[in-house]
Amino acid sequence: MSGTAERITVGVGAAAREIAVIGRAGAGPGLFWLGGFRSDMAGTKALALDDFGRDRGLAVTRFDYSGHGLSGGRFEDGTISRWAEEAQAVFDTTEGPQILIGSSMGGWMALLLARAHLAAVGRDASRLHAMVLIAPAPDFTEELMWAGFSDEIRREILETGVHREPSEYSDESHLITRALIEDGRKNLVLGQEIELGCPVVILQGVMDTSVPWRHAVRLTTHLTRDDVTLSLIPDGDHRLSRPQDIEKMLKVIEGMVG
């Protein structure tokens, strides 16, 4: 399939949700896109990745988390565990070695996906070819949300279950739920060593106001067993969607494809 979304069901019973997936058949290693919080698979970077795969005959997989884009479900029902489960289910539809490309929250999803994959199949059978993390935001619910909230906002979340956070990227507010925060604590990765068994490149804008560049530096201190390259882009923002940013991302991926 290519261009048209197909749907897979993730979860059972009341937890079942329809996840939209767009796959492009092609050679390996495949390119597996993991988007960010409130982003979808039709964003600038995701479409550039799809064009790159098309031009080089590579397999490309994109999908929307539940409550995002073309997928079913309500955004406010989303948690890190649910979205990670969906990423794993979509990954299981792919074949052969894959390059995981995770943007913002997608960077956290990529790390959780890799951990689950390695736990399931072991390092020798791993299909993780490489990883590109763009402004990665592991543990963001705790480190970049909860830690920065005022006592008033924290109390609002604990008492009402939700806080509406203005977004600098859209007119719609982000719904920050108590479930999102509490579930996030079950998925924290920055308190331990992370071993992926594949090369990792991190692209991070120094002018990023959503995920501070020091957050990416901190991530590297937990990836000491892998070949990790951190590229700081002095004038780059959080999105890293300018033509020169896209060019840099694709150049990195091209080097990984070989």
Where are these regions (language model features)?
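The serine-hydrolase catalytic nucleophile loop
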Residues: 37-50, 214
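N-terminal cap/lid segment of alpha/beta-hydrolase-fold proteins
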Residues: 1-26, 242
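Conserved alpha/beta-hydrolase
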Residues: 48-72
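Primarily recognizes the serine-hydrolase "nucleophile elbow" in alpha/beta-hydrolase
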Residues: 89-153
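Short beta-strand element of the alpha/beta-hydrolase
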Residues: 28-36
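The alpha/beta-hydrolase serine catalytic core
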Residues: 5, 124-233, 237-257
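Alpha/beta-hydrolase active-site loop signature
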Residues: 38, 65-70, 138, 237
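Catalytic nucleophile-loop/oxyanion-hole region of alpha/beta-hydrolase
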Residues: 68-94
